[in-house]
């Protein structure tokens, strides 16, 4: 569902009839830019590879991956809402100690699991408009209150203070 929802979060490029036409007001565009600037900075701060053998650390490129990062976040939120709605107010019994919401987020994380060499990490970071799988998960989830609620998280490595979070859609 997160992948399908991701494709639904393309923003201002198309009008209600599906024609390529930017339909936003200047105020809409300014508000959107303010939020996306925060998301870019969050991703720019991610060290994807530490410094090694005299080479500097490689950082994620939040500007390059912005469109896909927005789509991942929006798609995950839409998918989680659809998932909750499908339960019709019931709460399934935990499975293997995990609640339904926890399993939802674990399934999302599993979707993007990767085992790739450092050289490929460096290459993809420079040219792929998608963030690496680890960050499609961790950096996206850190902004979503429903994720924190699912795991009763109030601190720790994954925790981001509420005032630093940004939700685009």
For each predicted feature, which ranges?
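Single conserved hydrophobic/aromatic residue that forms the stacking wall/gate
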Residues: 1-5, 9-10
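Zinc-dependent metallohydrolase catalytic domains
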Residues: 11-169
